[in-house]
């Protein structure tokens, strides 16, 4: 082909990028080798990066013309060399340093070497005889590293020539691992020579020879899964030889010296660069532990101190170099400990958290380029497989495999995962590993990041043979990531179904899997967090038995639902509640459709059922409400005007107060359940929930009162109203909160006594018709004048007379949150006007302020339940609700007359105004607000979790963890939540004591 015929188009089609210089370089290569350009182009076309192959070939010819020209004398030899250096600049750099090693590619590599062949070859490189090298230190290191790299480029040549490198990946990885083991053995032989003799750091040769020293391969080295450039994880073990005069302590000293020198031979700087890092940090105690231990010391550590992840790391351990028999003893002795580790408490959770931490620690800029650690990467496959192995390997020795691919095959063979899933996982894993291999081969550098440069991605596509262009490769990679992530997220759970699915035909088993035994299924359930695996298995059996449409859909859905249940605080109760719900709704078309088609609804259902007994019990009474879980809009609090419209419609439909009240109680149950859903699933803040719960209670009272008044037909005789007090008046109700109220009436046509009797009858009807055993309503009138000693209902004039003559400071303070919630609007307006005169005095004397502080101190002393820890009481404790509310109310009593914005029944609104007006600093207000919100959330969370009201932060860790989960803490964070609460309230208490009591005036308190 002439220069004119060598067009840029031809060069581009051949894969060249730097077209401006390629033509001249091709002509130079043709001149130096004697090959016509027509022969060189196909040879370069076989290279992943033709530009680099051409450039490096010219460098080799210039650097070592004789060796390179000799090697490039045939087209086949040239093609083989160009393919290697076109895929690996690192290999070319090796040839430039050691031109004579070009001869290593003189013949095609048609088969992978055995471990024995590699070990013999590398020991020969250092002249090893009887385990001792005959070559001196620097010379030995160079000889070892050159021989290693000779073998490495031969392996690369074999790898690059494969027709199907995906299928051949595991053979190449095994050979690379064997090569690493051989290098360690050769370096150990050099180390023995260096450690023998007299002087510092040396020992008598006889003692060195007698010291038993084994190098245990961990991770990919142990599993024979190494990359071209991997850190090689190792653990060192020794044993004394008393008969040879080497006691254990002496053996540890000698072996430690051997370990240090062996590592140097592999990784320290020298004429020929180091090979890779030898990483011994998986040893007992990590970096802080002894580099070398005796076998007995290892066993003692793993028996007493080792954590769960350390046993997972040992899963791949094998004897890699040194004393083979000692290494096998180490592996054999630790195997029972490895395969029983999954039975440790919280083992699975700790491993899962470790996996999450790995992802969390990836820099944001690298996350989407990570082949290994990111979502859908290699670690997702390896993590899933290892977790399945550790769980099922407790009872099944066949799954105790070191390498990922063999383990996948064994798990499928034993029916712990489906064969199709195993095949998909296996193929995707091989593909990801091939990408990793080719990336590392490029520069013989350790990396797990996909290139960001399009040219580099195109080179990777050519090197792997997976795609013709960069875009195609990235598309394929993203598909693999999505597929791997999906399998990772569900694979661990799916096989549970086959243990209980009563399918008459074995061929109809789920995903083609054979069944697990009951014991195996129970072990899996226990491993993922079920406390009663036998009971859980019974529920699964009931849900999936038979051939009905419901059973079929639930068989398909339950695997992932079990995963979601296990992520909840109480998976057992969640599964039980799901079974009950399915028994109620399983025959309805919409329920089955929702389960099948709406993964969002199914996941939300598992979250609320496993996270709240309150919700589960209430949902059992309103099962149709599960339909809300499909729609975010249905999970938000309903607007008050919509509730009022529904209430008006109910009152219009029902002639009887009893039937109307029953319908209104059902509305309340329904809306409280909606709010519980909303809070647990994160659709509402604590303030929104408080307003919503207050509106629902207000709506119930409005409706029931309207039904009672209509039935009595006494509107002309008297006016009647309900005044909300406390948290109800402030629109601050939580789940399980009492509704503090007062009743007021005003005679119209009736006389005072008759009106009072009528009002008393209305109150009795209200108490009777709002009573609900399914969701109790506690109408508390304890804040009325004279407290428990006062009448349950008063006329407006009676209130006016009382407040004018007898009102105590606490009663005026209680009125700060008084708000009309139901009844005649004119009466409500007049009552609130009266309340304003009492609660917003033009001035408040020092005596009254002291009285407020005295009462608060008395409450701290007397109202706390006996034995209650004041630091943990959410309502009356230090820095909790009471402190914040009393502080705000004192500010209102002192300043609301002059500052109308303070005239609000809402604690948080008043606190914000107080900060804005300068009555409290912004920082102090923020601390008070944080404590009030935390305590309010915790009170509601305790009701949701236990279905009981409580005011004391529990000590029970199970309950505390359930509460913490509802407060959006991660699993196992009970102590963290507890510490956060105590810290928040401690800061709030400091503000309260300083700003409310003031150091000189603060009364003594024993609380």
Curated annotation (Swiss-Prot):
Q: Which NCBIfam families match?
A: PRK14109.1 (NF010707)
Report whether Nucleotidyltransferase shows up as a keyword of the record. Answer: yes
Q: What is its EC number?
A: 2.7.7.89, 2.7.7.42
* GO terms under cellular component: cytosol
- Catalytic activity from the UniProt record: [glutamine synthetase]-O(4)-(5'-adenylyl)-L-tyrosine + phosphate = [glutamine synthetase]-L-tyrosine + ADP; [glutamine synthetase]-L-tyrosine + ATP = [glutamine synthetase]-O(4)-(5'-adenylyl)-L-tyrosine + diphosphate
Return one GO MF term. Answer: magnesium ion binding
The segments labelled Adenylyl removase in the record are 1-496
Q: Which cofactor does it need?
A: Mg(2+)
Q: Which InterPro entries match?
A: GlnE (IPR023057), GlnE_rpt_dom (IPR005190), NT_sf (IPR043519), PII_UdlTrfase/GS_AdlTrfase (IPR013546)
Record-level GO BP terms:
regulation of glutamine family amino acid metabolic process
Q: What is this protein called?
A: Bifunctional glutamine synthetase adenylyltransferase/adenylyl-removing enzyme
Annotated region described as Adenylyl transferase, given as residue ranges: 505-1007
Pfam entry (one):
GlnE
Question: Which CDD domains does the UniProt entry name for this protein?
Answer: NT_GlnE_GlnD_like (cd05401)
Which purpose does this protein serve, as stated in its record? Involved in the regulation of glutamine synthetase GlnA, a key enzyme in the process to assimilate ammonia. When cellular nitrogen levels are high, the C-terminal adenylyl transferase (AT) inactivates GlnA by covalent transfer of an adenylyl group from ATP to specific tyrosine residue of GlnA, thus reducing its activity. Conversely, when nitrogen levels are low, the N-terminal adenylyl removase (AR) activates GlnA by removing the adenylyl group by phosphorolysis, increasing its activity.
Regarding protein family, the annotation reads:
Belongs to the GlnE family.
Protein keywords = ATP-binding, Magnesium, Multifunctional enzyme, Nucleotide-binding, Nucleotidyltransferase, Transferase
């Amino acid at each position: 082909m002439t220069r004119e015929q060598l067009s840029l188009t031809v060069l581009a089609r051949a894969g060249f990028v730097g077209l401006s210089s390629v033509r001249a370089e091709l002509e130079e290569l043709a001149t130096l080798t004697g090959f016509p350009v027509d022969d060189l182009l196909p040879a370069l076309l076989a290279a992943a990066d033709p530009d680099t192959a051409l450039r490096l070939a010219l460098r080799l010819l210039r650097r070592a013309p004789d060796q390179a020209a000799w090697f490039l004398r045939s087209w086949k030899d040239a093609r083989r060399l160009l393919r290697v250096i076109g895929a690996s600049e690192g290999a070319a750099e090796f040839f430039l340093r050691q031109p004579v090693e070009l001869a290593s590619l003189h013949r095609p590599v048609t088969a992978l070497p055995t471990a024995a062949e590699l070990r013999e070859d590398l020991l020969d490189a250092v002249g090893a005889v009887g385990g001792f090298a005959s070559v001196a230190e620097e010379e030995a290191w160079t000889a070892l590293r050159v021989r290693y790299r000779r073998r490495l480029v031969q392996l690369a040549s074999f790898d690059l020539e494969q027709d199907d490198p995906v299928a051949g990946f595991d053979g190449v990885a095994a050979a690379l691992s064997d090569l690493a083991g051989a290098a360690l053995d050769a370096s150990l032989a050099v180390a023995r020579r260096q450690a023998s003799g007299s002087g510092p750091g040396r020992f008598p040769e006889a003692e060195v020879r007698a010291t038993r020293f084994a190098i245990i391969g961990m991770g990919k080295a142990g599993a024979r899964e190494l990359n071209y450039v991997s850190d090689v994880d190792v653990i060192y073990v020794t044993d004394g030889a008393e008969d040879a005069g080497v006691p254990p302590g002496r053996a540890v000293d000698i072996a430690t010296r051997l370990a240090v020198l062996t590592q140097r031979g592999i990784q320290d700087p020298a004429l020929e660069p180091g090979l890779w890092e030898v990483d011994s940090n998986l040893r007992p105690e990590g970096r802080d532990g002894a580099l070398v231990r005796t076998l007995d010391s290892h066993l003692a550590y793993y028996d007493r101190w080792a954590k769960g992840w350390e046993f997972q790391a040992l899963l791949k351990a094998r004897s890699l170099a040194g004393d083979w028999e000692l290494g096998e003893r180490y592996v054999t002795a630790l195997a029972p400990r490895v395969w029983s580790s999954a039975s440790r408490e919280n083992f699975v959770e700790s491993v899962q958290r470790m996996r999450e931490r790995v992802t969390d620690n990836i820099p944001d800029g690298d996350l989407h380029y990570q082949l290994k650690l990111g979502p859908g990467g290699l670690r997702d496959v390896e993590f899933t497989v290892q977790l399945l192995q550790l769980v099922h390997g407790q009872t099944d020795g066949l799954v105790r495999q070191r390498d990922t691919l063999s383990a996948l095959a064994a798990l499928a063979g034993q029916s712990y995962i489906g064969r199709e899933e195993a095949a998909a996982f296996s193929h995707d894993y091989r593909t990801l590993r091939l990408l990793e291999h080719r990336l590392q081969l490029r520069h013989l550098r350790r990396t797990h990041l996909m290139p960001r440069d399009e040219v580099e991605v195109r080179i990777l596509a050519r090197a792997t043979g997976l795609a013709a262009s960069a875009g195609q490769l990235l598309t394929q990679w993203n598909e693999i990531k999505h597929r791997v992530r999906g399998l990772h997220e569900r694979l661990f759970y799916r096989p549970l179904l086959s243990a209980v699915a009563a399918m008459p035909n074995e061929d109809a088993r789920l995903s083609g899997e054979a069944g697990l035994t009951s014991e195996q299924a129970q072990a899996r359930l226990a491993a993922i967090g079920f406390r009663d695996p036998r009971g859980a298995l019974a529920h699964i059996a009931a849900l999936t038995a038979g051939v009905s449409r419901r059973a079929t859909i639930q068989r398909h859905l339950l695997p992932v639902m079990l995963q979601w249940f296990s992520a909840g605080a109480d998976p057992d109760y969640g599964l039980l509640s799901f079974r009950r719900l399915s028994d109620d709704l399983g025959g309805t078309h919409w329920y089955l459709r929702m389960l099948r088609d709406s993964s969002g609804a199914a996941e939300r259902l598992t979250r609320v059922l496993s996270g709240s007994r309150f919700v589960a019990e209430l949902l059992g009474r309103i099962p149709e409400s599960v339909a809300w879980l499909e729609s975010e809009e249905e999970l938000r609090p309903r607007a008050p005007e919509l509730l009022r419209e529904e209430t008006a419609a109910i009152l219009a439909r029902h002639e009887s107060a009893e039937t109307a009240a029953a319908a209104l109680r059902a509305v309340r149950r329904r809306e409280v359940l909606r709010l519980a859903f909303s809070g647990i699933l994160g659709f509402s803040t604590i303030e929104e929930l408080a307003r919503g719960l207050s509106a629902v209670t207000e709506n119930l009272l409005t409706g029931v009162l309207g039904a009672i008044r209509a039935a009595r037909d006494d509107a002309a005789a008297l006016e009647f109203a309900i005044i909300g007090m406390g948290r109800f008046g402030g629109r601050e109700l939580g789940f399980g909160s009492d509704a503090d109220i007062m009743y007021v009436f005003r005679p119209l046509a009736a006389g005072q006594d008759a009106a009072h009797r009528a009002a008393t009858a209305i109150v009795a009807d209200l108490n009777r018709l709002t009573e609900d055993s399914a969701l109790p309503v506690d109408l508390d009138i304890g804040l009325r004048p004279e407290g428990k000693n006062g009448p349950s209902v008063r006329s407006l004039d009676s209130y006016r007379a009382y407040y004018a003559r007898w009102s105590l400071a606490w009663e005026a303070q209680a009125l700060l949150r008084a708000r009309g919630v139901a009844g005649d609007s004119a009466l409500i307006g007049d009552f609130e006007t009266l309340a304003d005169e009492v609660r917003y005095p033009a001035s408040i004397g020092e005596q009254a302020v002291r009285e407020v502080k005295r009462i608060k101190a008395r409450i701290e002393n007397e109202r706390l339940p006996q034995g209650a820890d004041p630091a943990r009481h959410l309502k009356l404790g230090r820095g909790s609700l009471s402190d914040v509310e009393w502080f705000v109310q004192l500010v209102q009593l002192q300043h609301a007359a002059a500052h109308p914005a303070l005239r609000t029944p809402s604690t948080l609104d008043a606190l914000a105004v107080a900060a804005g007006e300068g009555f409290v600093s912004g920082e102090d207000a923020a601390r008070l607000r944080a404590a009030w919100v935390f305590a309010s959330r915790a009170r509601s969370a305790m009701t949701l979790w236990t279905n009981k009201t409580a005011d004391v932060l529990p000590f029970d860790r199970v309950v505390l963890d359930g509460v913490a989960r509802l407060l959006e803490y991660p699993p196992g964070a009970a102590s963290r939540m507890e510490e956060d609460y105590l810290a928040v309230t401690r800061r709030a208490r400091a503000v309260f004591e300083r700003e409310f009591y003031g150091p000189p005036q603060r009364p003594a308190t024993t609380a």
